[in-house]
Amino acid sequence: MAKDTSYDAVMDRRAEIMSRALGLNYDEFIISDIAFDYEGMMAKAGYSLEEVRQIQSESGVGNTPLLELRNITDLARKTSKRGFGARILIKDEAANPSGSFKDRRASVSIHHAKKLGYPGVLAATSGNYGAAVASQAAMKNLGCIIVQEVFDSRHVGQPEIIEKSRKCEAYGAEVVQLTVGPELFYVSLILLEETGYFNASLYSPFGISGVETLGYELVEQIRARYDKDPAYIVVTHAGGGNVTGTARGALKAGAKNSTIIGASVDLSGLHMASDNDFNKKSFTTGHTGFGVPFATWPDRTDVPKNAARPLRYLDRYVTVTQGEVFYVTEALAQVEGMERGPAGNTSLAAAIALARELPEDEIVVVQETEYTGAGKHPWAQLDFAKQNGIAVKRGAPKENKPGKTIVIPQNFSQITATEMDLNRMRRSYIRNALERNKVKNVTEEDIRFLAEDTKTDADFVTSVIRDLGVRL
């Protein structure tokens, strides 16, 4: 008898489908409605750092170059007060097989799928991760399906996303293209059930453990060359896996005093699931449309408990404008001779501003570059923005209005980073944890977990809970 594939029926079966597609029983880590054993989940489901390094070495992933951006550092110093302007370094993750750090994330999932005997892998993604999964699956001779949100209801798609679809197909993947909306998860569940494929989720412990090598490597490389740890590690932040994995790796390397700073493109006011807003943004990842909601409620993904938990690790969170990232993309190419895409250049734009805060003998490291899709060339995305009624001009970045105006800076001194209120986001996360789980009474175990999950303490959590009127 054929299974009921109506939306409600598939959603009712999602726990069963996900358990089979990951080979992981999340129930054993649950402590309460709020708390779960995060480190226990990472230890049991993931691989050790040395095991991951071996897995990645076998598939050509990792050990990417660490480059000093001397010319960009000089420009940052010229726009800093005397004696300030930290050295800016960048981890050239574009050297990975598919052109981004996502190869690290995909490598462990695909290795695990092969080890467990799955016939293939599936990933729901807008771009870079799909290319990484397809590339790694090709190496392991596994089937691969990539499910992408590509179009709005007019069937119009952004150049960057369409180019990344082509890249996935070039690696031999079957690409299922969807319009924006709630069907992404639904279609993914149906395909997982039909094919028996492994869910190469961005948010599983396998994916996050794959990124830990990035944080570990960059600390090792900086110590070997400069005999010190970086003052700031700047990470492009979207769904939280980049921040989580990089920070965990840096901590495992012993870099306890390095400040972890997330950076996102400011797309405030645009709704990521809105058909109307879908093509009004010029960035498909690394923006606040993912960065804020995934930080304030990480368990909104295709796994029961998200291994990407950015508030556990973020010390600061800043935003830059679309125009600033486009400007820095051009600067990196013309000043440093490196043509790279917007994901890494988001954190580079922030790093330029952040470097001005520190003395010249300190180090700011940007932990990724990427080289995939049309997004590495600003003109395709800017032309597309104009076609969708967005004004593009030169001027002051503060004039940027997401969905209306993209303002390209006129000079280097105009690049700034806007601080986000992390405590406000932490309070929002705690409220979501209580309300979404319908919690009426909070236990000491819940308070301990929430303090760890927000990088705060019991007093902070207790104060927020009392403000919400929940019984302790």
Curated annotation (Swiss-Prot):
Its cofactor is pyridoxal 5'-phosphate. The modification N6-(pyridoxal phosphate)lysine is found at K102. It comes from the Bacteria. The keyword Transferase applies. Its EC number is 2.3.1.263. Pyridoxal 5'-phosphate binds at N128, A238, G239, G240, G241, N242. Belongs to the threonine synthase family. This is 2-amino-4-ketopentanoate thiolase beta subunit. It comes from Unknown prokaryotic organism. The lineage of its organism: Bacteria, environmental samples.
